[in-house]
Amino acid sequence: MGENTRPFPIQPWVGEGKLSQKMLGEIITWKIQGVAISHADLLSGLMASDLDCDVAKELAPRNAFARACSKLDSERIIRKIAEDHATITFQFTREANEGGKFHYYFESLLFLNKYSGSITSENLELEQLAKEEFGRCMEARTANDVTRLVQRLFERHADLFSIRDQGGVYFVPEVHNDFIVKVERFVRNIGGSLQRFPIPAGSPQGDRAVQEAVAHGLQAIIDEHLQAVQKFGEDTRPDTLRRAEEKIRTTKMKIEGYSFYLDKKREDLEASLQQASELLRSRMSFLIGAPSEEAELVLV
């Protein structure tokens, strides 16, 4: 950086209270060191930061199992062949080079419970081997696991609005400032870092950028609602329909809560959410036999 003898523009404000203007929120980004973090250290960090420890239990077993498979695939091929709401089924196939040609022999199917992490197989030797490696991978969490954990914390207790299409940099509304402090403490407790960049209101560029980030993030949520409802069919469970209804209700509350940022974009978002609501009402009417007008959706 070259030498600059001009006064730094913010310098005269320091100590005079001129920075205490209304804040829109903060742009945050975090970095987790690329070393394995024990499950115990994660729990300790969450507890010390007064954060929800249950999210550590929700780190998907499938991610740990994928890492375990990389240790188990010597001379075998492992493929996912089926998945339902609770279980993923994998096929283990032994690969052998015989007479200059590869031959493939079915070994066994292995079943992974997506929630409990339990592993079962008719091949008890393979089951035990998979359990041992899976246990090691569940205990040692990666930086990607921690990033998903942080995102899950915000999903439960606040909101992250992506600034970049690639992710990694987010806007967090000012109302969640206290929660950012807790997450920052947690990230530092486990050896990472979290950078915070406060965004004051009143700058045309800043106001517009925040508005676009919040509107884009909310529209992405609505698009997810639409895509999910469009896939609902005769095998869709009633509790799945009710969860979709609750998600739409929650999104409506978010649009209302963040109306300060949205201005005229609020109308577009409400119209888009209305479309998702009407589609869900129609599907509920067809699937559970209730008249369309009796589907108790928050948007009518």
Regions picked out by a protein language model, each given a short descriptive name:
Residues L126-E127, Q219-V300:
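C-terminal accessory extensions appended to soluble enzyme cores
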Residues G2, I37-K57, N63-S70, A140-R148, ...:
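Terminal interaction module
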Residues Q151:
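Active-site nucleotide-donor binding segment shared across nucleotidyl transfer reactions
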Residues G2-L126, A130, F134:
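Charge-rich, low-complexity segments
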Residues M1-E3, L299-V300:
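Non-Sec secretion/translocation targeting segments of pathogen effectors
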